[in-house]
């Protein structure tokens, strides 16, 4: 996932190349979601750890979540066709790319919100059985329950548990249009509403 800095980076080319390289080892030589997550973190923090304690905590929890997903999904004879580990990896890479574009454009991207997004994306389809919701946010609520149990074990601050939970719930496809309407005409600022839009765009 390396990218050489240029005056006009080819972000689309970077994303397409990275997504293609994720597919080369899938599924028989899959390196694991923790490897993908760490590669994204290296891109965003330039090979360093976040300075903020909250961001460190969320990144650590994201690593625990990706490990949990691997433990749950790897033994499956067949994973869900779409909501599988490759999809989660695609979404992680995509939100990483969006954050890097924002950084390159000079936007303020607080590391707490970057870590929050990585954690939310890592968690948004945890133990997804495949298929679609029978009612609004059905499967998203299931993912939130798994996330909250792990977050409480890791003693994540309640404000970030709430924010990550909201981000996961807002990935219900029927809410995407309303999520985008919520920021229409607003300047970009890293908050829950704009982070929701970034997450929706990454959830390809």
How would you describe each model-predicted region?
Residues 91, 114-130, 143, 166-172:
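His-Asp-centered metal-binding catalytic motifs of divalent-metal-dependent phosphohydrolases/nucleases
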Residues 34-43, 79-116, 147:
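Alpha-helical phosphate/pyrophosphate-handling elements in metalloenzyme active cores
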Residues 133-146:
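Post-HEXXH active-site segment of zinc metalloproteases
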Residues 1-77:
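Non-catalytic interface/linker regions that flank or bridge core catalytic/transmembrane domains
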Residues 155-204:
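Histidine/acidic-rich helix-loop-helix segments that form or flank divalent-metal centers
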Residues 62-73, 117-121, 164-172, 198-202:
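Short alpha-helical scaffolding segments that buttress acidic/His motifs in well-ordered protein cores
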Residues 102-109, 133-134, 149-161:
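Inter-helical turn/loop segments and adjacent helix faces that build the functional surface
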Residues 64-92, 126-132:
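Active-site flanking loop/helix segments enriched in acidic
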